[in-house]
Amino acid sequence: MSKKLISIVNVKDYVGQEVTIGAWVANKSGKGKIAFVQLRDGSAFFQGVAFKPNFIEKYGEESGLEKFDVIKRLNQETSVYVTGIVKEDERSKFGYELDITDLEIIGESHEYPVTPKEHGTDFLMDNRHLWLRSRKQMAVMQIRNAIIYATYEFFDQNGFIKFDSPILSENAAEDSTELFETDYFGKPAFLSQSGQLYLEAGAMALGRVFDFGPVFRAEKSKTRRHLTEFWMMDAEYSFLSHEESLDLQEAYVKALIQGVLDRAPQALDILERDVEALKRYITEPFKRVSYDDAITLLQEHEADEDTDYEHLEHGDDFGSPHETWISNYFGVPTFVVNYPASFKAFYMKPVPGNPERVLCADLLAPEGYGEIIGGSMREDNYDALVAKMDELGMDKSEYDFYLDLRKYGSVPHGGFGIGIERMVTFVAGTKHIREAIPFPRMLHRIRP
């Protein structure tokens, strides 16, 4: 067909006009003289209706019946050019309908495996390249896109410069036991866990920087919140205090939620997400509680009937049940601040007057989604950082460039990182992180 194509998402601008859409057949139904065809083109879903008498009237009996029969026999995922008149229809869940006047098959589809019936998780993951075409999976990807768009918009508006950190490195930013190792021309190299160390160099040059890209963690974990490859946004900034950093993180998360509400409302509707809850997370201030106060709260409530977490002492790290309880207790995203230095990273700056605690924060999302952001102030004193590395038995020669940052005009600075897939899962309201990335990499899955 030579007619100009429009996207389904824009059909509201063409009411009463004849348009042509390039799409795939998501489903079809009907009987006798009428056929319903559900169409998708990546931007949205839309229903077309074909009436046999209209085809006979327009094309004559023989050609009209032939064209109508083609529509009746369409298979799921057949690609088509479909032409028709856009009409408003309050009865339709899409709000509009296409009165089909012509249809041309582009590519046939036979025995499409991911049918509308229920399928097991392994089957769907084996066919992830096809499962992505389903209505809910498309909605999740649209939410992911809105979050990425809002990320770039937020940091641009707040004076940050995009600063690309390397994926290959010779040292670890976090836990050296969770590294993927590869050969780099005869030398060991590792896939990046985080761009943070390099971003600190960027912050000393440019003031405020962020990066966004894939990171890798060789975690042998099979939980619903872990991937071995995921996309991380890391931000670093000079001259901000700890409280100012928390303010920035809160503003960022609220901007992401607002971005999804603005750019992907239909996706939230498809997923039946509680939009009022998302709006409340924007309007209400996030809670801030110290690690020690959070431990005390957990101890005070551990005998409650609705709790199912293990007892913790001061100095213990939280598990997922503890994070869930804390965020649900406050009902909004909650910062837990000033964790013990004993289980946090070497580069975190101690709390003034309390060296056993560090100036850090984890942001816990409500509704059981747990940690979505981790951040801290960085140790900016050369001697203090060297002493900490010696205490941990670290090889300082592997971090010479990082130590240099403290030797030449060091300043107070900090940063934070967010796993985009965890944020997508939270905003979309889905149950498992594997649906928040196009092709998830997990402990026992590396294809498709």
UniProtKB/Swiss-Prot annotation:
Subcellular localization, as worded in the UniProt entry: Cytoplasm
Keywords: Aminoacyl-tRNA synthetase, ATP-binding, Cytoplasm, Ligase, Nucleotide-binding, Protein biosynthesis
Matching Pfam families: tRNA-synt_2, tRNA_anti-codon
Catalytic activity from the UniProt record: tRNA(Asn) + L-asparagine + ATP = L-asparaginyl-tRNA(Asn) + AMP + diphosphate + H(+)
Enzyme Commission (EC) number: 6.1.1.22
Record's subunit section: Homodimer.
Classification via HAMAP family: Asn_tRNA_synth (MF_00534)
Name assigned to this protein: Asparagine--tRNA ligase
Protein's organism: Streptococcus pyogenes serotype M6 (strain ATCC BAA-946 / MGAS10394)
